[in-house]
Amino acid sequence: MAVQQNRKSPSKRDMRRSHDALGFSTLSTDSKSGERHRRHHVTKDGFYRGKQVIVHPVESVEVDDEV
């Protein structure tokens, strides 16, 4: 098991943790739909880099003719 040789000061601990903060994700605008999305991710409409890569199925409406 690893055991530290000397105790680290709070300053050294905080300097090590200085890079742990979460940053904001970079957003891009789709050229086709104009929708904002995370970079390198598909938009909610299914577009990626101006091309439709996912086609959402159309919900069919059932009609009852038994009236």
UniProtKB/Swiss-Prot annotation:
Compositionally biased region (Basic and acidic residues): 11-20
Domain of life per record: Bacteria
Keywords for this protein: Ribonucleoprotein, Ribosomal protein
Entry keyword annotation includes Protein transport: no
Molecular-function GO term, any one: structural constituent of ribosome
Gene Ontology biological process: translation
Cross-referenced SUPFAM superfamilies: Zn-binding ribosomal proteins
Annotated segments matching region Disordered: 1-44
Matching Pfam families: Ribosomal_L32p
One GO CC term on file: large ribosomal subunit
Keyword presence, Lipid metabolism: no
Assigned protein family: Belongs to the bacterial ribosomal protein bL32 family.
HAMAP family associated with the record: Ribosomal_bL32
Protein name: Large ribosomal subunit protein bL32
Native source species: Dichelobacter nodosus (strain VCS1703A)
